[in-house]
């Protein structure tokens, strides 16, 4: 009997001690990771995020969009893919792809020398200025026109990226000949000028070429995005192979480096440096390089950060990210050691009908708090809600024609609820 009593006392004491160790998680969020057992989810909060959630994350923001003034909307006039915005002598400058054709895009099979295949086909690079970032004055002629045939780019030049280096201005762009499209050869070319107002001169050679046969970017280099980091010119870009299929790379992002804006540029030996994304958006941030990654890949719709410009990690998950952002980032091309203060606003493009390749685009502005110098808590909210039309619009609602298919699948798949 005494032995039984002793065992009961030991078990009771063990249970008491165990319950004491498993204290409830407090209402006041601990700033340090607790030293008592917590769930895997709570451990991630401290190990990968921070106890203040998105409120305390400098690389988290919402994006608040505004229409721009000054860009007249006309039939078959498209504006898209803005560069970073720069400010020179009190004036903001931006360059962008613009298609001005007599016909809307018709796809690759039906395109002609005058009828575009895609929204960025038969395009030139245009320029606009502003004193406040909301109202813009567009030049009356293109800043950079397509080079003459048979030079690379005679079909279309598009998706420019601006670099300011040693007092000169460089516009990098993708150059298509003889046709645009996902399986058309596309290197990066560059034009240069002594002033943001031009005139611009085409450099005769391509400066970044697609990779070798069998590589991840063997057919095209798109969306060149220059950043100066550690006294080097880094040009980020989207790449893809000519081969298509579920087993192939769809699109990823890489980087090439140079000390000279006209090259040669050397690709990173660990390319691709981002495992997805569509249009590129990189800027100096907090001693490293930040990237806004959207639309494609397993880490889509995230902000990422790299200490060296090549090894990126997810820093936050974002909602309703901009398409083709071109941020105002005054230290994007700063030489020497710079900490990178981040961005508070940017231009981007929107397809009014929700399309992509075969519809026109407009430029828009968004404001955000991806900056070390401001603290806009309204832009740090993470509980965004939308009206009914947002859920039923094209691209989000169930596609037309699918109702019959869904009903047929339900007949085969939907079983009676299991009740014991």
Regions from the language model: what does each represent?
Residues 1-5:
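Bacterial N-terminal signal peptides that target proteins for export
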Residues 6-15:
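Bacterial N-terminal signal peptides
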Residues 17-19:
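Sec/Tat signal peptide C-region and signal peptidase I cleavage site
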Residues 21-420:
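Carbohydrate-active catalytic/glycan-binding domains of CAZyme proteins
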